[in-house]
Amino acid sequence: MPTVQQLVRSARQKITTKTKSPALKSCPQRRGVCTRVYTTTPKKPNSALRKVARVRLTSGFEVTAYIPGIGHNLQEHSVVLVRGGKVKDLPGVRYHVVRGTLDTAGVKGRVNGRSKYGVKRPSDS
């Protein structure tokens, strides 16, 4: 426990937290343009072809973003909205593409968890 005089001399240090998504610059989402759309493989023990995109953000960063859901319509020069959130089995992928906004279409035929994949409520007919 420091004395009052010690605290006068040098105040207590604030604990600084490091951000997990620096490219967003404290914004909830950022717009960007796809520079490359490709598939990559996850680390052991998983096996798949995960769809990812290299995105140039309006903040000036170029990041790798995961494209969630089954099937997508993204290609080079597509304008996308990017949010934070890493993919556990893809090293270096710390961002997600938001489905159903800008040039990104929602997931076709999705019935459950629609809000996460940009799908409107199906009409009852």
From Swiss-Prot:
Belongs to the universal ribosomal protein uS12 family. The lineage of its organism: Eukaryota, Viridiplantae, Chlorophyta, Ulvophyceae, Oltmannsiellopsidales. PANTHER family: 30S RIBOSOMAL PROTEIN S12 FAMILY MEMBER (PTHR11652). GO terms for biological process: translation. Keywords: Chloroplast, Plastid, Ribonucleoprotein, Ribosomal protein, RNA-binding, rRNA-binding. InterPro entries: NA-bd_OB-fold (IPR012340), Ribosomal_uS12 (IPR006032), Ribosomal_uS12_bac (IPR005679). It is found in: Plastid, Chloroplast. This is Small ribosomal subunit protein uS12c.
